[in-house]
Amino acid sequence: QIGLRGETVDAFSDDLPLYDRLFLGGSKSIRGVDFREIAPRIYAHENKKGRYVAWGGQTSWCMNMEYSVPVVKMLRVAVFSDLGSVGEDDFDFDTAWFCWSVGLGLRLDLEQFPIRLDFATPVVDPDESVDEKVFTFSVGYDF
C-alpha cells in the first residue's frame, strides 16, 4: 500500500491559531515519532526554564509505504516506511522539518475491527537529539 497526503492552510489575519496548525507524527502519519512531534518550533519559557515546543506549520505532506505478508488467516506482518515534512508558511515545502522512519508491525484483521501494532524508529529526524523507538497501537484501517 502507498498513501500520500498534502495539506496547506492560510489565515485572513497574520496569525494562524494553534488549533488550525499542522503537525506530523503518530500512528496516522509518521509512526517513528511521537504524536504531533514534527513541526516548526518556538522557544517557550516556563518556570525560568526555556525549551523549544512544537508550534505547528501551515503546509504538510506525508507519504506512507507498507508491505504486508499473511501469517495466518487473520494475522499479517508488515514492514513500512513513512516520510514527510511540515513547512512554516502556506505553500512552504521547506525540508527543515523533514522526517523519515521505518518499522515493523502486526495486523490483526478482526471483522469490522482491525488492530495495528507498530514498532518504528526514525532514520532522519529533525530533532536529532531524540534517539527514540516508538511503539504504537491503533484500531482502524491503515493511513
Where are the predicted features?
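Membrane-spanning beta-strand positions in outer-membrane beta-barrel proteins
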Residues: 1, 76, 114-116
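Membrane-embedded beta-strand positions in outer-membrane beta-barrel channels/transporters
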Residues: 1-3, 62-64, 101-105, 136-138
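C-terminal outer-membrane beta-barrel translocator/porin domains of Gram-negative envelope proteins
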Residues: 1-71, 79-83, 87-89
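Outer-membrane beta-barrel translocator/channel fold
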Residues: 7-24, 115, 121-134
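Outer-membrane beta-barrel channels and translocator barrels
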Residues: 9, 70-74, 109-113
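Residues that define the transmembrane beta-barrel architecture of outer-membrane proteins
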Residues: 27, 57-61, 96-102, 131-135
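Strand-loop-strand
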Residues: 89, 95-104, 108-110
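Outer-membrane beta-barrel "beta-signal"
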Residues: 104-115, 132-143
